[in-house]
């Protein structure tokens, strides 16, 4: 802690000591005072947290994890494992495919860049995938080639031309 942080922490604890404890016999006015003092304590703790220097990488990681949990709508990461166990088996006809957790991890050099991730338990993320059969993609490619017609370029003998005409098709080349 820096000296400034220690001073703020001391001030926060001094305020916390002055917060009265409410029992059933206390009045509404005392409850309001307690609420005010609690909010004041929370403000000092928040200031303290901001005054402690954290490396930018830690802040970025925390923000990334929070965004990821929001996107996946995970309230508590510890409950994630329990939900996976309780879920009934799903089949491919429902359009949902489940990857076996025993499946090996990627062997690519960039796939698992941090060795710490090997010991962590995986989490499930919903991904929507569309499958296009090979025959559809071929017909799309041939349709687009048939519909575009190129006329052969004028043969002026220029050496600066950046295009070639071969076998009835027009190619563009980078110089």
From Swiss-Prot:
Region ranges (Disordered): 85-175
TM stretches of this protein: none
Record's keyword terms, sorted: Cell membrane, Glycoprotein, Immunoglobulin domain, Membrane
Membrane topology of the entry: Single-pass type I membrane protein
Cytoplasmic topological intervals: 1-175
Post-translational modification, as annotated: Glycosylated.
Compartments where found: Cell membrane
Keyword Glycoprotein part of the UniProt annotation: yes
Biological role: Component of the elastin-associated microfibrils.
Name of the protein: Microfibril-associated glycoprotein 3
Gene coding for it: MFAP3
